[in-house]
Curated annotation (Swiss-Prot):
GO terms of molecular function: ribosomal large subunit binding
Protein keywords: Cytoplasm, Protein biosynthesis
UniProt superkingdom: Bacteria
Role according to the record: Responsible for the release of ribosomes from messenger RNA at the termination of protein biosynthesis. May increase the efficiency of translation by recycling ribosomes from one round of translation to another.
Protein name: Ribosome-recycling factor
Gene giving rise to this polypeptide: frr
InterPro entries: Ribosome_recyc_fac, Ribosome_recyc_fac_dom, RRF_sf
Location in or out of the cell: Cytoplasm
């Protein structure tokens, strides 16, 4: 595995963790909160994003305008059944969700969830490091690398890991600051 391949894989892990962070509520309304909601539409589970336009007209409201009005009831039901705890308001054409301010207890829960996502991201990064080091050791056994080259390559892999873990920690700190901001 080349350094570029390793960095690309690690970048994808960090981006996946960032997408997970985006699904966590902060004090403001954000349409990405609804990214994981699937709607029963003509017998198939369909992502909400492909059934409606999502917007945030103000900091406390998410607005959902379905492309097909017949999907309105299904969308409303899916949002009400989700673990987000939102109560959708349906006016016959548009669904509005008022995002209430977070309580201190909920903020702490969301910080714990963000930490959990960050830890999962770190585990994924460490697994990539382990795979890369195993390949290097295998190449050393096969005679492609000398012992010194192998050690240098392993040090490079570790430095790459450290860089991406620091980036992940920075994203986590930023998300926690967003969550805790009143």
């Amino acid at each position: 595995m080349s350094t570029q391949d390793l960095e690309a894989s690690m970048r994808k892990s960090v981006e996946a963790t960032q997408r997970n962070f985006n699904t966590i509520r902060t004090g403001r309304a954000n349409s990405s909160l609804l990214d994981r909601i699937s709607v029963e539409y003509y017998g198939a589970e369909t992502p909400l994003k492909s059934l409606a336009t999502l917007s945030t007209p103000d900091s406390q409201t998410i607005q959902i305008q379905p492309f097909d009005i017949s999907a309105l009831a299904s969308i409303e039901k899916a949002i009400a059944m989700s673990e987000l705890g939102f109560t959708p308001n349906n006016d016959g054409k548009i669904i509005r969700i008022n995002v209430p301010p977070l309580t201190e207890e909920r903020r702490k829960e969301f910080c714990k969830l963000a930490s959990k996502y960050a830890e999962e991201g770190k585990v994924a990064l460490r697994n990539l490091r382990r795979d890369a080091i195993d390949k290097i050791k295998k190449q050393e056994k096969e005679g492609e690398f000398s012992e010194d080259q192998s050690r240098d390559e392993q040090d490079g892999v570790q430095k790459t890991l450290d860089k991406f873990i620091a980036e992940l920690e920075k994203h986590l700190a930023s998300k926690e600051a967003d969550i805790l901001k009143v």
